[in-house]
């Protein structure tokens, strides 16, 4: 455990870690201070940071299990001590660390008797397990325990619904949040009109991120949310002449974008954010990492520019075009790129 004496700066606003410890492989703790703040600022920042820490940071989880030999979720399998439901609950608790975008596949194939733990999961190279000792199942007989897994990176919760069930496939209620808990408190000091505040922020994580990494990512996400407000132009905030659609000719992708850009003054392109257009999370994350936040940002990039984005594919460009057609009510010819 690392703990530092709290010293209050009277000059530059600054974050500082004053306590850090690792309680287990799946429980990290960090305590930070931000000072000096004017009266009222600490609560504003503390509330925003807590919400960003708990709701805006992405995590990686097992979201589905595939096995054709299992009749239903609450069945038991000969030679396995746990029920299928208990195995699903154990898989739900597996903590993963990754740079994954979207979904990926993994698997387990173990011959009994013996214990199946997290270290038996065969993962893609860009995904790793935080705690290899996490228990999955106990094999009591000489049987082959082979299942497929679906891994996904997302944020918040993923609640299984009836339409998510498929033959031989069982969804898991996934909790993507790497931050287990976050609290903030405020200490005031000074006299009269000179009162200032110190913000104390406590962060607990599941080990896939350190509290310091979580704080950095939450801060980055908050900054990204506010950046568009720095570029607002008054003349682009509202639709003009009741123009709700943009007619485009069936040209190439580049020509379509050029046509939209030419007509951009007729629509509030800067007030339409890409997260409003139902883009898949992988495409959205790629665009966000390239500082593309609004429809105007998107239309200022050519097809060649988009293809230079890391992890971007031609299919993604087609999907973006489909979104443009949907939201601008455009009837375009389907050209091959």
Swiss-Prot record:
Gene Ontology CC: chloroplast; DNA-directed RNA polymerase complex; mitochondrion
Region (Alpha N-terminal domain (alpha-NTD)) residue spans: 1-233
Chain intervals for the UniProt region annotation (Alpha C-terminal domain (alpha-CTD)): 265-337
InterPro entries documented for this protein: DNA-dir_RNA_pol_insert, DNA-dir_RNA_pol_RpoA/D/Rpb3, DNA-dir_RpoA, RBP11-like, RNAP_asu_C, RNApol_insert_sf
Coiled coil residues, start to end: none
SUPFAM superfamilies named in the record: C-terminal domain of RNA polymerase alpha subunit, Insert subdomain of RNA polymerase alpha subunit, RBP11-like subunits of RNA polymerase
Keywords: Chloroplast, DNA-directed RNA polymerase, Nucleotidyltransferase, Plastid, Transcription, Transferase
GO biological process: DNA-templated transcription
A single MF term (Gene Ontology): DNA-directed RNA polymerase activity
Reaction(s) catalysed by this chain's protein: RNA(n) + a ribonucleoside 5'-triphosphate = RNA(n+1) + diphosphate
Subcellular location: Plastid, Chloroplast
Record keyword Transcription present: yes
Chief localisation class: plastid
E.C. number(s) listed in UniProt: 2.7.7.6
Domain notes: The N-terminal domain is essential for RNAP assembly and basal transcription, whereas the C-terminal domain is involved in interaction with transcriptional regulators and with upstream promoter elements.
NCBIfam families: rpoA
Family membership noted in the UniProt record: Belongs to the RNA polymerase alpha chain family.
Subunit: In plastids the minimal PEP RNA polymerase catalytic core is composed of four subunits: alpha, beta, beta', and beta''. When a (nuclear-encoded) sigma factor is associated with the core the holoenzyme is formed, which can initiate transcription.
Job description of the protein: DNA-dependent RNA polymerase catalyzes the transcription of DNA into RNA using the four ribonucleoside triphosphates as substrates.
Record's protein name: DNA-directed RNA polymerase subunit alpha
Organism: Nicotiana tomentosiformis
This protein's encoding gene: rpoA
